[in-house]
């Protein structure tokens, strides 16, 4: 394990204090943040989705956070900040006061994301895709490192939510604690972790600076993809377009946009960078299935496709071995 891997592992251990059986979600959220992507946590109320989001603030030095519970009546003012009355009166400019709201935050948590109205959705598309917010006549570059969205349901069909859904590169289904001993430990644990607002006076020693964040992204994007990885990705892409579901006569086409594939590559490059690899290698493709499903019933099929694409070439190479 290289030094960066050790540091990230230590950071994740600290962040997960007081959170149970959410190590996978926290690790994926941190990977999304480092790659400049966003994550959607899908699951019923009370499964620690918000705790995962809150702890991520402490992964970064002096990070600011913003969280909001969406409703059908939420307004852009509540998310992006109120309109400055003084600017409107003196300069005749429609400018928002963004301090303390989403445009000023490093880590954002939006609960019940699909309840956002069209005006909020449109602004979020630009925020997620370009890290920009149009404030009056000015485009503001946002400090945003991670946006975590949560919901207990999939986006409704026919309501124009497809574009926003596509912006969340990683999608994870969250569950209640499954291990009985872990559940009992959670019941008696009175430790206040970062996710409960128990932030220590001193920042975590492993926390990531803005300079490191920028440098890691720049260096990771220079990593090449091996030919095996390109072949595996092509195989996965072709197979997800023809997935045979048990209850359907015709294969299902799991739609993955070209833009999504491009962002997936950035995610894989960051994973390779953290692992100290000189290039993106086939074993690092395993988390891909978190990026390639649109309906929960597709997950096991996508998992199988990804695993086959990674390990089939290895199996084939073994068949050509000759005994001494």
Regions found by a protein language model. Give the residues of each.
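Conserved C-terminal "switch" segment of AAA+ ATPases
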Residues: 174-248, 277
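Walker B catalytic acidic pair
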Residues: 111-112, 123
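Walker A/P-loop
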Residues: 34-71
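Conserved Walker
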Residues: 20, 42-45, 68-69, 89-99, ...
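C-terminal engagement/docking regions of AAA+ P-loop ATPases
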Residues: 246-253, 273-321
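Canonical AAA+ ATPase core
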Residues: 86-88, 115-120, 128-204
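Short glycine-rich substrate-engagement loop in P-loop NTPases that contacts/grips substrate
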Residues: 75-102
């Amino acid at each position: 394990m290289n030094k960066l891997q050790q540091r990230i592992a230590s950071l994740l251990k600290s962040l997960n204090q007081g959170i149970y059986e959410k190590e996978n979600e926290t690790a994926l959220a941190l990977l999304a943040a480092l790659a400049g992507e966003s994550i959607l946590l899908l699951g019923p109320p009370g499964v620690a989705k918000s705790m995962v989001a809150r702890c991520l603030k402490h992964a970064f030095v002096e990070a600011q956070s913003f969280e909001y519970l969406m409703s059908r009546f939420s307004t852009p003012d509540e998310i992006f900040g109120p309109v400055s009355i003084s600017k409107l009166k003196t300069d005749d400019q429609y400018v928002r006061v963004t301090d303390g709201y989403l445009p000023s935050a490093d880590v954002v948590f939006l609960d019940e994301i699909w309840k956002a109205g069209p005006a909020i959705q449109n602004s979020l598309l630009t925020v997620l895709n370009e890290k920009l917010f149009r404030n009056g006549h000015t485009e503001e570059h946002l400090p945003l490192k991670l946006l975590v969205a949560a919901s207990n349901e999939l986006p409704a069909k026919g309501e124009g939510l497809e574009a926003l859904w596509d912006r969340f590169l990683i999608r994870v289904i969250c569950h209640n604690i499954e291990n009985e001993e872990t559940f009992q430990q959670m019941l008696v644990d009175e430790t206040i972790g970062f996710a409960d607002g128990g932030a220590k006076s001193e920042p975590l020693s492993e926390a990531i600076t803005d300079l490191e964040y920028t440098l890691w992204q720049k260096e990771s994007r220079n990593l090449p993809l091996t030919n095996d990885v390109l072949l595996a990705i092509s195989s996965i892409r072709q197979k997800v377009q023809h997935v045979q579901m048990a209850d359907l006569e015709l294969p299902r086409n799991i739609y993955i946009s070209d833009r999504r594939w491009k962002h997936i590559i950035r995610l894989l490059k960051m994973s390779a960078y953290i692992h100290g690899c000189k290039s993106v290698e086939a074993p690092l493709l395993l988390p891909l299935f978190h990026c390639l499903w649109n309906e929960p019933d597709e997950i096991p099929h996508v998992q199988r496709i990804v695993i086959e694409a990674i390990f089939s070439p290895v199996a084939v190479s073994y068949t050509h071995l000759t005994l001494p």
